[in-house]
């Protein structure tokens, strides 16, 4: 066949040259000179198939050329010119390729879309030193770089890569013996041809090859007797009968009608056709139900990985340009053609930037080399090119059942490093298998069958004597079996109703206080510097959860008021039984439930001492290293992986608050599979929220509309939020919803920010937006912080998290794939175990704590000084010191002290014409001046009442007779201060003050407990007050007792007699005016 094609290509090349020779040599030479002199003009040879379905390929090339120019991928002076000519019509493409080369000087070829012409032009292209890029052809021969050294392909699938993917799937299931069904002619172009070479290198035996004549009907296939041969030699059968879907349909109908198909047979169908919207059972003129049955339990391998959003966006853009809405097949073809030109543009840019100059597009081999070993995001998703410039697509295997295809294994494309490629060219690229579903096969175990049945292909390898013995026992079993089974069910039911998880109320002892060492995260009253951190209890994963002890085990509990007796249905009894026996290093232990006692319903989990991940991650004072984040993320994934493979099946309410940390810094998932049960009983009024005396709510489950509950539910999948918002109920949950929530948890662990922190919306608004979103434009998801781009998290990990947030639940990755991705992309940076890292961090923390203690001590000392200053301003210093040390302050009588009163003349008039703020400002300014004067003397300000000011000297510290001198000096300075004092709001106002003082015995003591005041009592205080009230403005009136002290002991003071005045309660008293003082002592 290949020799025939080579012969045809030689004849066509000769014919092309004869056609071209008809044109004058002068015309050719003149045209070539013109074209070669135009630097930067890239002439594109487009060989357009005659298929009318894809008639708009030239428009697609123009779209891509415009995009390359707009995105500055092409150098500035480059221009793309497209020449479109017919192909795939009696080898017209070969003639037109020659025409484009010799007369148009084409720099690159796109197409043709048919294999026969591609094989010919692909051999001519290296002779002309131009690259040729296929976007539809998938022939196995195209990967031969000896014959096609300048050929590249961006086709969504190819025979060679499909063969590699098929071998990967065979190896995944340990199938080492297979059969192949292929067409009797033309199979060289299919993946089965490449598959025959691939399996020889992978130790897979090919037991049988079945050739089927083209266009054979099911009856004709059965009549050949070949199916009997197939049955006797293979159970794993790879079926590929060309691009025509009807050939495969007829073969599968023959298998179905011959009744040789059962769960021992696996038919693997590599599907090269791209018409994914057209399944065999949707074709016309077929019995759709029979075709569905014929394809049931087949495995279909097809291209996978292009996002539907890319498809829809391209279709809209194409429609806007052409006004045509292309069908599915045409759109995929157009998208591949777009990617082909985009790949060429990238290669051309790289060659130019490497110094190729503006004529670099004439060097086809150099351009081709830049198309190898690279990847980019194209219209069909991620385009991964191997060392042969052939696209390595990702594939998926689908299980067909009842007309529905479900992905069971994803085969992810991957380029290996250059070292592996140099050792073995076949290892330059590979497919990595990710199982998405297990136990789906219709066998008793749900597992896929082995390559060879237990008794061989013909059944001759088994000894059937045990079956005869078994038959003799069958009667006995049929007699005794039902009775035994009935006893077994009764025993199982009894165990179910034993309720090993039920805890007697009398064995539970409530702990009123929360231990600082064990639950410091639950209260703000703890020191924020403790290693466990601190958070408001409303933000703790163990919110309401009081602590209790049962049989020596410390528990976190949630309490509810029980309205009436509770009876659990069997489904809930099974759930609680599984909860009780469920144990894993990354799951918190469910301790049990106490109910139908003391009108209380108590849910108990083992206490985790360090609180929740939310408390730890959002405590800014906790400087956790990357190793802790890596360990936390892996622990959460491991815990969820265990749940998804356990009888519990899912968590139901995964969030950061339900991820607890124990004393060993291991993350344990909690509250799994219980919240929906509790809410159901609250909703049926069997339970009520427990009212705590400390005003904490019982549980956010009781009301999913509360802010805290909404904060937790904000991390749930949109379908869960939708049900919470619309029905105010908590759904049971699912594995796909857990995966969405896992993405949220990983996001918060890695970046230590809350989801949607960048959106200035309330939690209510965010919940409503998530619940009501029904359009791609309305979907909102957290954004990765730009400040964390240097954290070292690669794009694969971030893409995995984004995949967890997909709107359609079925498209989210399974937990096994997420675990593989997390383990591969999250690596610890330090040496030693996490405990070693924790110990090192604690050492650093201890050093940091010393600095923190030093800083806090300094702040405390400063606060103490401020308190002392405030206390000393309220009480005499000696009295304040006694009160601070708890020494009782007893009332005391002083034989002689001097008391002064002052009062502002006209204060009432000034106050009535000023605002309250002006009055306060005025008094503050004046009394601040008085305070400054007192501070320079041995005197104490007792109190101020309005504009009245009271001072004493000689109390509480006695100072002989100096108290009279101190008060006299203060009085003179006060009068001088007032004479120069100006009101800020009435500067023209002349201020005047009355001052009076008296010397005599007084009693003093502290009065009051809440606001203690140091008060003076006695006749001396009354007399001093009368000296002020009967005085004259800007005069200092003193009593006879004060005069005698000053006159005898301090003659420097100048005093004049005023005379006798009437004093209330005293009668006539002789008083004096203090005028001033001289330097005489």
UniProtKB/Swiss-Prot annotation:
SMART domains, sorted: CYCc, S_TKc
Span of domain Protein kinase: 520-826
Membrane-crossing segments per the record: 467-487
Topology within the bilayer: Single-pass type I membrane protein
Glycosylation-annotated residues: 77, 105, 363, 402
UniProt KW ATP-binding keyword: yes
Alphabetically ordered keywords of this record: ATP-binding, Cell membrane, Cell projection, cGMP biosynthesis, Coiled coil, Glycoprotein, GTP-binding, Lyase, Magnesium, Membrane, Metal-binding, Nucleotide-binding, Receptor, Signal, Transmembrane, Transmembrane helix
Annotated tissue distribution: Expressed in BAG sensory neurons.
Residues reported in the UniProt entry to bind ATP: 526-534, 558
Domain writeup: The protein kinase domain is predicted to be catalytically inactive.
Name this protein carries in UniProt: Receptor-type guanylate cyclase gcy-9
Organism: Caenorhabditis elegans
């Amino acid at each position: 066949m290949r020799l025939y094609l080579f012969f045809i290509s030689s004849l066509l090349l000769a014919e092309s040259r004869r056609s071209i020779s008809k044109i004058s040599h002068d015309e050719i030479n003149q045209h070539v000179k013109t074209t070669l002199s135009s630097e930067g003009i890239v002439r594109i040879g487009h060989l357009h198939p005659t298929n009318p379905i894809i008639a708009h390929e030239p428009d697609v090339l123009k779209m891509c050329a415009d995009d390359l120019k707009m995105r500055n991928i092409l150098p500035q002076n480059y221009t793309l010119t497209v020449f479109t000519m017919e192909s795939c019509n009696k080898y017209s493409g070969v003639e037109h390729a020659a025409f484009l080369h010799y007369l148009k000087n084409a720099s690159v070829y796109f197409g043709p879309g048919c294999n026969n012409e591609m094989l010919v032009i692909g051999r001519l292209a290296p002779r002309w030193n131009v690259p040729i890029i296929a976007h539809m052809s998938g022939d196995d021969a195209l990967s031969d770089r000896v014959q096609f050294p300048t050929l590249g392909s961006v086709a969504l699938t190819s025979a060679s890569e499909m063969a590699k993917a098929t071998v990967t799937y065979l190896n995944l299931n340990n199938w080492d013996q297979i059969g192949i069904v292929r067409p009797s002619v033309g199979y060289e172009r299919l993946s089965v041809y490449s598959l025959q070479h691939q399996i020889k290198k992978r130790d897979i035996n090919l037991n049988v090859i079945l050739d089927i004549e083209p266009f054979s009907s099911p009856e004709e296939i059965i009549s050949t007797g070949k199916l009997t041969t197939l049955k006797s030699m293979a159970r794993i059968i790879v079926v590929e009968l060309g691009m025509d879907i009807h050939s495969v349909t007829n073969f599968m109908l023959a298998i179905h009608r011959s009744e040789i198909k059962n769960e021992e047979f696996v038919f693997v169908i590599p599907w090269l056709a791209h018409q994914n919207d057209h399944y065999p059972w949707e074709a016309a003129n077929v019995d759709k139900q029979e075709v569905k049955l014929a394809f049931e339990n087949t495995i279909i391998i097809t291209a996978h990985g292009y996002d539907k959003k890319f498809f829809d966006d391209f279709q809209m853009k194409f429609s806007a340009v052409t006004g045509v809405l292309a069908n599915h097949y045409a759109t995929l073809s157009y998208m591949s053609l777009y990617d082909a030109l985009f790949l060429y543009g990238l290669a051309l840019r790289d060659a130019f930037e490497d110094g190729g100059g503006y004529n670099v597009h004439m060097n086809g081999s150099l351009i081709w080399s830049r198309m190898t070993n690279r990847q980019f995001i194209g219209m069909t998703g991620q385009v991964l090119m191997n060392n042969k410039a052939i696209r390595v697509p990702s594939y998926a295997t689908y299980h067909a059942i009842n007309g529905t295809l479900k992905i069971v294994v994803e085969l992810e494309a991957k380029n290996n490093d250059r070292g592996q490629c140099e050792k073995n060219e076949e290892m330059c690229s590979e497919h990595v298998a990710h199982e998405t579903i297990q136990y789906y096969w219709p066998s008793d175990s749900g597992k896929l069958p082995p390559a060879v049945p237990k008794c061989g292909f013909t059944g001759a390898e088994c000894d059937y004597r045990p079956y005869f013995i078994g038959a003799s026992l069958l009667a006995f079993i049929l007699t005794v079996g039902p009775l035994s089974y009935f006893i077994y069910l009764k025993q199982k039911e009894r165990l179910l109703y034993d309720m090993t998880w039920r805890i007697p109320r009398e064995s539970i002892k409530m702990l009123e206080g929360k231990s600082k060492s064990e639950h410091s995260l639950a209260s703000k009253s703890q020191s924020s510097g403790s290693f466990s951190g601190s958070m408001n209890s409303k933000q703790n994963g163990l919110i309401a959860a009081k602590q209790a002890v049962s049989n020596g085990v410390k528990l976190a509990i949630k309490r509810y008021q029980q309205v009436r007796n509770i009876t659990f249905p069997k489904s809930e009894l099974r759930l609680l039984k599984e909860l009780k026996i469920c144990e894993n290093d990354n799951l918190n232990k469910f301790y049990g439930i106490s109910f139908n006692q003391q009108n209380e319903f108590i849910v108990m989990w083992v206490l985790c001492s360090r609180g929740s991940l939310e408390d730890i991650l959002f405590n800014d004072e906790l400087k956790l290293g990357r190793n802790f984040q890596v360990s936390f993320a892996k622990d959460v994934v491991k815990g969820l992986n265990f749940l998804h493979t356990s009888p519990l099946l899912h968590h139901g309410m995964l969030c950061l608050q339900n991820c607890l940390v124990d004393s060993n810094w291991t993350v344990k998932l909690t509250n799994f599979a219980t919240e929906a049960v509790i809410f159901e009983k609250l909703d049926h009024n069997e339970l009520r929220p427990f009212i705590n005396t400390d005003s904490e709510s019982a549980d956010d489950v009781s009301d999913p509309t509360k802010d805290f509950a909404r904060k937790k539910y904000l991390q749930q999948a949109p379908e869960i939020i939708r049900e919470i918002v619309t029905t105010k109920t908590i759904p049971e949950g699912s594995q796909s919803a857990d995966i969405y929530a896992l993405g949220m948890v990983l996001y918060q662990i890695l970046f230590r920010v809350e989801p949607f922190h960048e959106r200035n919306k309330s939690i209510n608004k965010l919940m409503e937006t998530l619940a009501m979103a029904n359009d791609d434009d309305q979907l909102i998801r957290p954004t990765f912080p730009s400040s964390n781009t240097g954290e070292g998290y690669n794009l694969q990990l971030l893409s995995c998290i984004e995949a967890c947030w997909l709107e359609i639940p079925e498209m989210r990755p399974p937990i096994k794939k997420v675990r593989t991705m997390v383990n591969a992309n999250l690596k610890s940076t330090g040496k030693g175990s996490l405990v070693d890292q924790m110990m090192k961090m604690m050492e650093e923390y201890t050093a940091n704590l010393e600095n923190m203690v030093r800083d806090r001590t300094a702040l405390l000392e400063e606060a103490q000084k401020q308190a002392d200053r405030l206390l000393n301003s309220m009480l005499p210093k000696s009295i304040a010191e006694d009160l601070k040390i708890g020494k009782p302050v007893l009332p005391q009588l002083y034989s002689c002290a001097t008391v002064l009163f002052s009062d502002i003349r006209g204060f009432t008039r000034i106050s009535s014409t000023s605002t309250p703020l002006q009055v306060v400002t005025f008094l503050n300014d004046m009394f601040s001046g008085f305070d400054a004067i007192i501070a320079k003397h041995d005197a104490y300000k007792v109190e101020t009442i309005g504009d009245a000011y009271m001072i004493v000297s000689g109390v509480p510290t006695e100072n002989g007779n100096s108290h009279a001198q101190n008060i006299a000096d203060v009085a003179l300075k006060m009068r001088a201060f007032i004479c120069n004092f100006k009101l800020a709001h009435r500067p023209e106002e002349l201020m005047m003050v009355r001052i009076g003082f008296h010397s005599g015995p007084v009693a003093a003591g502290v009065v009051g407990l809440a606001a203690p005041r140091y008060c003076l009592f006695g006749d001396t205080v009354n007399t001093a007050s009368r000296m002020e009230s009967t005085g004259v403005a800007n005069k200092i009136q003193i009593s006879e007792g004060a005069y005698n002290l000053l006159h005898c002991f301090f003659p420097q003071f100048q005093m004049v007699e005023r005379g006798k005045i009437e004093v209330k309660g005293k009668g006539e008293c002789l008083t004096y005016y203090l005028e001033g003082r001289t330097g005489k002592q």
